[in-house]
Amino acid sequence: MMDGTNFDDALTGEQKIRNFNINFGPQHPAAHGVLRLVLELDGEIVERCDPHIGLLHRGTEKLMESRTYLQNLPYFDRLDYVAPMNQEHAWCLAIEKLTGTVVPRRGSLIRVLYCEIGRILNHLLNITTQAMDVGALTPPLWGFEEREKLMVFYERACGARLHAAYFRPGGVHQDLPPDLLDDIEAWSHEFPSVMDDIDGLLTENRIFKQRNCDIGVVTEEEILEWGYSGVMVRGSGLAWDLRRAQPYECYDEFDFQIPVGKNGDCYDRYLVRMQEMRESLKIIQQAIVKLRETKGDVLARGKLTPPSRADMKTSMEALIHHFKLYTEGFHVPAGEVYAAVEAPKGEFGVFLKSDGTNRPYRAKIRAPGYLHLQSMDHVAKGHQLADVAAIIGTMDVVFGEIDR
């Protein structure tokens, strides 16, 4: 019988259209590295968003079990390679907690200084590439110019622009060169005008606001459910910052504000990052003042750290200690510890389990971007395809730390 009764759409008069699946990335310029999203689209609306990770997986946590504690330090530079020193910081704090090492004050201040430089490095890249993802081409050019100056400060402190390995258990590897503090201070007085320029281009820009306001809204309940940290939390109005909530190093001596948003959308997260850069500048300027007053060693001399060059030329024991330290490495007392820092992307934590040998028994890395990306399906559902790029941009994902 051919009267059409066995065709549903003939009865309803509407045709059922199958949703179609597309790949977003890994070659997409807005995918920030090797992100692959499988998107199910209903026309232009995202119905489902499935992140496929692991394209940059290098087995870091497993590799760390067969290296000494010091040899593991450079792996942390390669996680979030946008602001490398912040990650080393967490590893050093974990080792210092287990061994009970006290960092000398000057070393502690240098760490704070470079962590804040790292925060500005990260936020500059994030804000400017976020602008590029939604169609503004000028900010990235300005942002990279400023990042270049900061990279030079990295290089002058430790000889490397990117993979620094500058923080060591017990402090930092070497003291800062004499003129470096003056140059950082001079830069910190010039930088606000650059931020004002970026501010003028983006903050009240109609197109930028249309692309970011009410996109990727995150509520306070969702923050707790998905385990967000960092700007994703502060953009929604919760003033949670580990530098203030669980002060580590000497952050409790510094005077700075914690910027918070109120709508929890992409635009608020952009505003929070802009303001955080200004707060980081305050911390940098305070750290420079404190460093000028504080003299002394930058590394806690002891079993964890190498003897000075002068000692090695005169003392046989110092030479033996140096040789043992760089071949066998130092032994860490058995136990387990969790150390976390407020990295630019969120709470970067290290869970370290030691069995008393010179190698970690297990090290678990808590990457903030991993938890943010995992909620992509929840956040992007119901948005348009073009908004996916804006959401990923403000989540601030870097695949070194997500795939690790």
From Swiss-Prot:
Alphabetically ordered keywords of this record: Cell inner membrane, Cell membrane, Membrane, NAD, Quinone, Translocase, Transport, Ubiquinone
Superkingdom assignment? Bacteria
Chief subcellular site?
membrane
Signal sequence bounds: none
A GO molecular function held by the record: NADH:ubiquinone reductase (non-electrogenic) activity
Q: Name one GO cellular component term.
A: plasma membrane
Topology relative to the membrane: Peripheral membrane protein
Catalysed reaction, written as an equation = a quinone + NADH + 5 H(+)(in) = a quinol + NAD(+) + 4 H(+)(out)
UniProt-annotated location(s): Cell inner membrane
Q: What is its EC number?
A: 7.1.1.-
Q: Which HAMAP family match?
A: NDH1_NuoD (MF_01358)
Q: What does this protein do?
A: NDH-1 shuttles electrons from NADH, via FMN and iron-sulfur (Fe-S) centers, to quinones in the respiratory chain. The immediate electron acceptor for the enzyme in this species is believed to be ubiquinone. Couples the redox reaction to proton translocation (for every two electrons transferred, four hydrogen ions are translocated across the cytoplasmic membrane), and thus conserves the redox energy in a proton gradient.
Q: How does it assemble?
A: NDH-1 is composed of 14 different subunits. Subunits NuoB, C, D, E, F, and G constitute the peripheral sector of the complex.
Q: What is the name attached to this protein's record? A: NADH-quinone oxidoreductase subunit D
Provenance organism: Dinoroseobacter shibae (strain DSM 16493 / NCIMB 14021 / DFL 12)
